[in-house]
């Protein structure tokens, strides 16, 4: 059986990266929440 996690930096960036977060209103809300919480890393 194939494992579910097949790492790929390109897909990681495209799906969870900063620019993809900024592209949608909900993504910006996520970044706002993470800034408010004081996260060192905002996105992948």
Curated annotation (Swiss-Prot):
Q: What residue spans carry the region label Disordered?
A: 15-44
Keywords noted in UniProt: Ribonucleoprotein, Ribosomal protein
Q: Which Pfam families match?
A: Ribosomal_L34
GO molecular function terms attached to this record? structural constituent of ribosome
- Which domain of life, per UniProt? Bacteria
Task: Read off the InterPro entries from this record.
Answer: Ribosomal_bL34, Ribosomal_bL34_CS
Q: Where is the composition biased (Basic residues)?
A: 30-44
| Gene Ontology CC terms | ribonucleoprotein complex; ribosome
Q: Which GO terms describe its biological process?
A: translation
Against PROSITE patterns, the record matches this protein to: RIBOSOMAL_L34 (PS00784)
Keyword Ribonucleoprotein listed? The answer is yes
**UniProt xrefs under PANTHER family:** LARGE RIBOSOMAL SUBUNIT PROTEIN BL34M, MITOCHONDRIAL RIBOSOMAL PROTEIN 34 FAMILY MEMBER
Q: What family does the entry list? A: Belongs to the bacterial ribosomal protein bL34 family.
Q: What is this protein called?
A: Large ribosomal subunit protein bL34
């Amino acid at each position: 059986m194939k494992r579910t996690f097949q790492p790929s930096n390109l897909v990681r960036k495209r799906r969870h990266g900063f620019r993809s977060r900024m592209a949608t209103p909900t993504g910006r809300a996520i970044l706002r929440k993470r800034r408010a919480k004081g996260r060192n890393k905002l996105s992948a």
